[in-house]
Amino acid sequence: MTPIVYLHGFASGPHSGKAQFFRRKFAERGIAMEIPQLDEGNFEGLTISGQLKVIDRAVGGEPAILMGSSLGGYLAALYAARHAEIERMVLMAPAFQFPRRWRERYSAEDWERDGSIPVFHYGDGRERRLGYRFAEDAAQYEDEPVFSQPALILHGVHDTVVPSAISTGYAGLHSNVKLMLMESGHELTDVMDPMWSQVADFLAVPESIDRESITLSVD
């Protein structure tokens, strides 16, 4: 099966609940999933461009499937729009319109003056500083990347962080996108089994390892 790269959300990390859930599900079927640390341990210096470079190294110029949660979903779309080697994607509550919505949420003047802002980091379980370079860098990227690869979007109808209407509008404009609305919020952690069913079907994941087909040779 084509290698799978999972992109975690903003202020999260490789050990998030969804990332580990999907890693376990794929592993049970003999499929490896890579989960890069997108901030490379430097959250204050985080940028969209820097995260795209991390993805580039993980993909390595070879065919790949991208899975992304929230900001990770937006990053997956950005990357796929620029890299034809991405075969297909699974986007969970993708943070489309991220640059615009961040400009509306935070005062650029105050952020630039102070140099950084406090942000709760869910992966670390504590507050961290995020540098103004994040806002400067994000401004160069499109709100809704246009890609040609097949994509499955999973979005909670009760999402108050990234409203599901954003994904509904996006899917309505792009025939290569399949949208599944879930009875959940932004995190989607209470519908992971139904999500797995959708993901497994979309990616044509085998039910389990065919152990009878595995032979061992002894020299």
Regions found by a protein language model. Give the residues of each.
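Short, surface-exposed "cap/lid" segments of acyl-processing enzymes
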Residues: 1-40
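Short, surface-exposed alpha-helical segments at coil->helix boundaries
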Residues: 16-20, 49, 163-168
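Aromatic pocket-lining residues of Rossmann-like dinucleotide-binding sites
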Residues: 26, 79-83
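Active-site loop/turn elements of alpha/beta-hydrolase fold enzymes
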Residues: 35-41, 94, 184
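Catalytic nucleophile-loop/oxyanion-hole region of alpha/beta-hydrolase
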Residues: 36-59
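Gly/Ala-rich beta-loop-alpha elbow adjacent to hydrolase catalytic centers
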Residues: 67-76
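The alpha/beta-hydrolase serine catalytic core
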Residues: 86-219
